[in-house]
């Protein structure tokens, strides 16, 4: 019996393990006008304060909404919460709609993208200044690409089964080590996610704004596409940071990761220094380091812990270890009114359980570079017949199909185990359905949306058609988890909470930033 099979059997003896997976969702979506253009209006007051609202905030731009669910154990509850949030938001948007694709709608110029505003508090001003820095460093267009983030953790019973009884400090160390094992395996095999669920094979030519690219795009009107691409969002055209390529951040342990991250936020950038930090009394960025703050680090998956007041993400991890992981490589699903569906959530359950139960050897920089090259191939040409991927750094290759089948052989066993514990056949059904997509790439989301784009005559028309449909769906939706009263109450609470923060402000902004970044002066 393999170690994977042994570990699965150990966990299977505690069926309650599978009932207590913790999941949360974050979905980004641009507000757009009936004409199909990015909206210029401020974040609607009827949605509450973006700074303090628990479920509805903004990401980079005023027009880029972000919907956040709390943590739940039931898949149905998770999706009901997200549907309710979409319903409430759409009722407050007038004739504006939510863009249903990851790649943005028509953008006349970068200057038309208004940075997200969070009020007059130092916290709020710092959030906007961070975005000003991103704009000056990378341009605004890259920042308004939308995605879905999936937050996930295993219950204590899962770790009990794997590790037995442990003291608290030993348990936390074991959990952190295991989550970093998940992260390494995600880099190794996570290309399956853009293969199956990537949904950005095309973009509007306005997105390039004259930038040169060597990619062999084909065109439909003003839409550019790659025939076998799965996720241009995850390509070099999407959210990546070439300046970060110099960083040496490893994933072999929490200590190695934190050391790399702490070095990164202290690494000066000659390129970003040329932009200036404060010029003629006006701030242009938080600082001129490679990363202004830790959140700027690009990653398809992140180790996370809920932060305490005033705590940076790395401080939270150093204090108490990894609490959950954040999967960040999901495109918005254009065939769902809420950007993700039940099949995807259940597949992620299976896949993340598999990455935790499988062996996960340490990974050096060379190996990580090889895995990243596999990701690059899959996002640009994942549906290409006979596409070969590297197995490590030793010249061995395997077709995507052959490798995916090996993974699904294990996923089927996990699906059987989970269904036996939970009752029904939901996981086996999802596994069987998605396995057919391996030999039939035309069934993948990227192939389906590309077919729609060709049928409609472009990305803009496709997005508008789907956006119209989902506006109606979201408006007609009946609350399943929340209520109108709860939603209105959160609007009032968040608005008051922002006012309270602003009223208590005592430091001027310069002093606040000096205090916040005091850690950069400290010895790491």
Swiss-Prot record:
Pathway: Sulfur metabolism; glutathione biosynthesis; glutathione from L-cysteine and L-glutamate: step 1/2. The keyword Kinase does not apply. It is an enzyme of class 6 (ligase). Its EC number is 6.3.2.2. Pfam families: Glu_cys_ligase. The keyword Nucleotide-binding applies. Coiled coil: none annotated. SUPFAM superfamilies: Glutamine synthetase/guanido kinase. Keywords: ATP-binding, Glutathione biosynthesis, Ligase, Nucleotide-binding. InterPro entries: Gln_synth/guanido_kin_cat_dom (IPR014746), Glu_cys_ligase (IPR007370), Glut_cys_ligase (IPR006334). GO terms for molecular function: ATP binding; glutamate-cysteine ligase activity; metal ion binding. GO terms for cellular component: cytosol. One of its GO terms (biological process) is glutathione biosynthetic process. PANTHER family: GLUTAMATE--CYSTEINE LIGASE. Belongs to the glutamate--cysteine ligase type 1 family. Type 1 subfamily. This is Glutamate--cysteine ligase. It comes from Vibrio cholerae serotype O1 (strain ATCC 39315 / El Tor Inaba N16961). The gene is gshA.
């Amino acid at each position: 019996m393999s170690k994977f099979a042994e570990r699965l059997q150990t966990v299977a003896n505690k069926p309650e393990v599978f009932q207590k997976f913790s999941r949360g969702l974050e979905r980004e979506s641009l507000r757009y006008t009936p004409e199909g253009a990015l909206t210029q209006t401020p974040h609607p007051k009827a949605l509450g304060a973006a700074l303090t609202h628990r479920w509805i905030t903004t990401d980079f731009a005023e027009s880029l909404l972000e919907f956040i669910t709390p943590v739940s154990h039931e898949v149905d509850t998770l999706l009901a919460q997200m549907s309710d949030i979409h319903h409430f938001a759409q009722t407050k948007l007038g004739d504006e709609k939510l863009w249903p694709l990851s790649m943005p709608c028509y953008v006349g110029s970068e200057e038309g993208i208004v940075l997200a505003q969070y009020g007059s508090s130092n916290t709020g001003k710092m959030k906007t200044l961070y975005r000003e820095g991103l704009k000056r460093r990378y341009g605004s267009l890259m920042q308004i690409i939308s995605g879905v983030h999936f937050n996930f953790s295993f219950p204590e019973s899962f770790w009990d089964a794997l590790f037995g009884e442990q003291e608290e400090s030993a348990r936390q160390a074991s959990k952190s080590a295991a989550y970093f094992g998940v992260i390494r395996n995600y880099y190794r095999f996570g290309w399956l996610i853009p293969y199956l669920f990537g949904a950005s094979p095309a973009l509007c030519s306005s997105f390039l704004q004259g930038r040169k690219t060597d990619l062999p795009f084909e065109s439909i009107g003003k839409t550019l596409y790659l025939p076998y691409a799965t996720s241009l969002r995850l390509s070099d055209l999407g959210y990546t940071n070439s300046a970060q390529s110099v960083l040496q951040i490893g994933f072999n342990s929490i200590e190695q990761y934190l050391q790399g991250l702490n070095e990164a936020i202290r690494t000066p950038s000659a390129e970003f220094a040329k932009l200036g930090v404060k010029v003629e009394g006006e701030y242009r960025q938080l600082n001129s380091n490679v990363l202004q703050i830790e959140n700027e680090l690009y990653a398809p998956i992140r180790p996370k812990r809920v932060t305490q007041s005033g705590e940076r993400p790395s401080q939270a991890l150093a204090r108490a270890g990894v609490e959950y992981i954040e999967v960040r490589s999901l495109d918005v699903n254009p065939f769902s009114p809420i950007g993700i569906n039940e099949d995807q959530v259940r597949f992620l359950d299976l896949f993340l359980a598999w990455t935790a139960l499988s062996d996960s050897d340490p990974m050096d920089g060379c190996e990580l570079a090889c895995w990243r090259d596999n990701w690059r191939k899959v996002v640009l040409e994942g549906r290409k017949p006979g596409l070969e991927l590297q197995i490590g750094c030793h010249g061995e290759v395997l077709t995507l199909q052959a490798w995916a089948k090996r993974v699904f052989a294990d996923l089927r066993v996990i699906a059987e185990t989970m269904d036996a514990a939970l009752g029904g056949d939901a996981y086996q059904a999802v596994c069987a359905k998605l396995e057919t997509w391996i030999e039939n790439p035309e069934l993948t989301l990227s192939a389906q949306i590309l077919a729609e784009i060709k049928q409609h005559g472009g990305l803009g028309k496709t997005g508008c058609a789907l956006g119209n449909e989902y506006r109606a769906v979201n408006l007609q939706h009946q609350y399943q988890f929340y209520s109108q009263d709860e939603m209105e109450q959160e609007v009032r609470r968040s608005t008051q909470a922002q006012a309270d923060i602003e009223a208590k402000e005592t430091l001027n902004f310069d002093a606040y930033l000096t205090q916040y970044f005091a850690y950069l002066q400290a010895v790491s």
